[in-house]
């Protein structure tokens, strides 16, 4: 059995999804996701010019050897561009493997560890009352867990994942108005003084059973993060996400020394070598890698296995910067992983997205139920794909009140 060709598609409804289709001489094909948010042409070019020509003639069943070929053969490897490209190919090879075996991927991993995977939605508000309404909306839909983000009084602009006006939704589609990003203003002092009280108000309103998550998006210094994590201990957060810049992993040791608030990190990590020390030293409670950015299913399974040895649970990234193909890979990993924690879930099921990526994965009552179809359980409609062209886009950048560049 040989790989005969592979195609790369860029485009989609509201996002420039990068989709890889690997074809074989048996007629079986596999699909993978290489979407790198607002940098989509980079993995697409890497795939088209370098990786796809090398795949031709290889045996798609040898997914481990191909992964090693892609990774070790690159020499200048790791990083989001390379790992997204490797990840898409690996995902497609697993899809082929499942179709050949006539099994859903979770069966190839070792079978189900659970019947459904708990997900969390994104509740946002321009102010606290607006946020409360958003949380109530998710609770009414059956969600057991909600990430909460809120506008900060006195902050000059809306911040990460917060709408500009009350009652508005925070759109996660790309801003296609041009390459130059918009600027948001951040003030850590205002955040640290106000947010702990807001989180406690949410806990008091919705009671002890709702899982509350909160994302700092890498914006605090180590001392500030330790202070904040300690201050919110009475809230009993399910997790505090990305409290410090991802590059400064020693910062999490300081946070850990001062607080028992669970810590989640990893959506920007591209390999096991960026998180192995955090896991082995048990400085985190949840690992947030994605099958796209972290080199595909093969590599993410290694991370999950290592995490399980150290009581670290999964909480895979699930923003709309991943296509339904990546989310399907996560659904299968979540069904299998004995150390599953929770799955980020933003509804992608618009009519346009469903037409482009037909699937029978289900979400109900705050749980994702994995498809039993062979492989990933998601298809790709090339005729629908022809409707979409690449559009340059951007997401905001962040500056402090004095103009200093800061982490988005």
Curated annotation (Swiss-Prot):
Disulfide bonds: none annotated. SUPFAM superfamilies: Enolase C-terminal domain-like, Enolase N-terminal domain-like. It comes from the Bacteria. D-arabinonate binds at residues 217, 267, 288, 317, 344. The keyword Transcription regulation does not apply. Mg(2+) binds at residues 215, 241, 267. InterPro entries: D-mannonate_dehydratase-like, D-mannonate_dehydratase_GalD, DgoD-like, Enolase-like_C_sf, Enolase-like_N, Enolase_C-like, Mandel_Rmase/mucon_lact_enz_CS, Mandelate_racemase_C. One of its GO terms (molecular function) is magnesium ion binding. The keyword Hydrolase does not apply. Pfam families: MR_MLE_C, MR_MLE_N. GO terms for biological process: amino acid catabolic process; carbohydrate catabolic process. Keywords: Magnesium, Metal-binding. Belongs to the mandelate racemase/muconate lactonizing enzyme family. GalD subfamily. Has no detectable activity with D-mannonate and with a panel of 70 other acid sugars (in vitro), in spite of the conservation of the residues that are expected to be important for catalytic activity and cofactor binding. May have evolved a divergent function. This is D-galactonate dehydratase family member OG2516_05608. It comes from Oceanicola granulosus (strain ATCC BAA-861 / DSM 15982 / KCTC 12143 / HTCC2516).
């Amino acid at each position: 059995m040989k790989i005969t060709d592979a195609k790369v598609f860029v485009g989609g409804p509201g996002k420039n999804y990068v989709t890889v289709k690997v074809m074989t001489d048996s007629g079986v094909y596999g699909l993978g996701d290489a979407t790198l948010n607002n940098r989509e042409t980079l993995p697409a070019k890497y795939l088209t010019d370098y990786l796809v020509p090398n795949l031709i003639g290889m045996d798609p069943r040898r997914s481990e050897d191909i992964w090693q070929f892609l990774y070790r053969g690159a020499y200048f490897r790791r990083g989001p561009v390379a790992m997204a490209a490797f990840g898409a190919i690996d995902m497609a090879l697993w899809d082929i493997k499942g179709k050949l075996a006539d099994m859903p991927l979770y069966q190839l991993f070792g079978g189900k560890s659970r019947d459904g995977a708990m997900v969390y939605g994104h509740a946002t508000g321009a102010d606290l009352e607006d946020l409360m309404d958003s949380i109530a909306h998710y609770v009414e839909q059956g969600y057991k867990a909600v990430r909460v983000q809120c506008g900060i009084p006195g902050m000059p602009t809306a911040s990460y994942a917060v709408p500009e006006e009350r009652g508005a939704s925070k759109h996660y589609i790309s801003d296609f108005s041009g390459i130059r990003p918009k600027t948001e203003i951040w003030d850590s002092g205002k955040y640290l003084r106000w947010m702990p009280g807001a989180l406690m108000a949410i806990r008091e309103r919705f009671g002890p059973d709702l899982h509350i998550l909160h994302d700092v998006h890498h914006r605090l210094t180590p001392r500030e993060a330790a202070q904040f994590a300690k201050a919110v201990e009475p809230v009993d957060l399910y997790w505090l996400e990305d409290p410090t810049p991802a590059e400064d992993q020693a910062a999490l040791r300081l946070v850990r020394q001062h607080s028992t608030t669970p810590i989640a990190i990893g959506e920007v990590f591209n390999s096991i070598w960026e998180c192995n020390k955090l896991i082995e030293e048990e400085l985190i409670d949840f690992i947030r890698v994605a099958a796209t950015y972290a080199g595909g299913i093969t590599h993410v399974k290694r991370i999950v296995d290592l995490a399980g040895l150290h009581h670290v649970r999964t909480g895979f990234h699930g923003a709309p910067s991943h296509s339904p193909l990546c989310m399907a890979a996560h659904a299968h990993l979540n069904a299998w992983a004995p150390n599953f924690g929770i799955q980020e879930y933003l509804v992608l099921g618009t009519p346009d997205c469903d037409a482009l990526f037909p699937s029978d994965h289900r979400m109900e009552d705050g749980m994702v139920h994995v498809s039993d179809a062979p492989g990933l359980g998601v298809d790709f409609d090339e005729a629908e794909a022809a409707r979409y062209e690449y559009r340059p886009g951007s997401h905001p950048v962040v500056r402090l009140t004095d103009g200093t560049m800061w982490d988005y």
